[in-house]
Regions:
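Acidic, low-complexity terminal tails and accessory targeting/binding regions
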Residues: 1-3, 39, 45, 76, ...
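Active-site-proximal alpha-helix that buttresses catalytic centers in soluble enzyme cores
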Residues: 2-4, 8-73, 77
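Short active-site segment of divalent metal-dependent hydrolases/proteases
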Residues: 12, 154-155
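Amphipathic, non-transmembrane alpha-helical scaffold segments
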Residues: 29, 33, 57, 98, ...
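Generic structural signal for well-ordered alpha-helical scaffold segments
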Residues: 37-44, 127, 131-139
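Short beta-strand scaffold positions
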Residues: 54-55, 128, 149-150
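Short glycine/proline- and acidic residue-enriched helix-loop micro-motifs
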Residues: 104-125
């Protein structure tokens, strides 16, 4: 059995008001830095990870670095963990997108599995990428604990895959900043032990 600890990066500017950050490389805020430190402590106290994989964006690298300092695990950047490519929507607020692409914005919330972002990706593209990371973990880290630091969208997609749920259920899973999800990966099945656990952040 391989244990997967799935973490979303800490708080960044651009969460409020809601906007499509995508691949814009924004650093952790001061709150996000504290999130990362608390998450690192929680992981170090509970598990002994042997490897940490992160998205190539700075907010995930910063979060992964905090976990590495606390656990002494090695960190590797994985391009396939990059955030969803929102194309023309990137860095626009939800209000801006709704005003300009009202029908597609409505579809994104009603049927996300049917959307391809203008000059960007679809959820199917995202799942194909994060699945590569999952296969690598299963191949190279049998009977180990591995941390993956990713983004809201990628983490949701990965959890849906592990839960054997369709992409139409995208909005039924949530991923808060520095939330932890724990998954046991067995040879023929996976067991999701917790999703979006944030008890370690109550002091922030």
């Amino acid at each position: 059995m391989t244990r997967l600890i799935l973490v979303r990066h800490g708080h960044v500017e651009g969460i409020h008001p809601p906007r499509f950050r995508g691949r814009r490389d924004v650093a952790l805020s001061q709150t996000g830095i504290r999130h990362a430190e608390l998450t690192a402590g929680r992981i170090a106290r509970t598990w002994r990870p042997t490897a940490i994989y992160t998205s190539p964006l700075g907010r995930c690298i910063q979060t992964g670095a905090a976990i590495a300092r606390a656990t002494s695990a090695c960190t590797k950047v994985m391009e396939d963990l990059n955030d969803l490519h929102y194309g023309d929507w990137e860095w626009r607020t939800h209000a801006e997108v709704q005003a300009r692409w009202s029908d597609l914005f409505e579809c994104w919330h009603a049927a996300p599995h049917l959307v391809r972002f203008p000059h960007g990706e679809s959820l199917q593209d995202l799942v194909a990428r994060v699945s590569n990371v999952l296969r690598l973990i299963l191949d190279q880290h049998q009977k180990e604990t591995v941390v993956v630091v990713g983004h809201d969208s990628g983490n949701r997609a990965l959890l849906l895959q592990l839960l054997d749920q369709p992409l139409s259920a995208y909005w039924r899973v949530t991923q808060d900043p520095c939330a932890i999800s724990e998954v046991e990966l067995h040879a023929r099945a996976s067991v999701v032990r917790c999703i979006n656990e944030t008890q370690h952040l109550v002091s922030v």
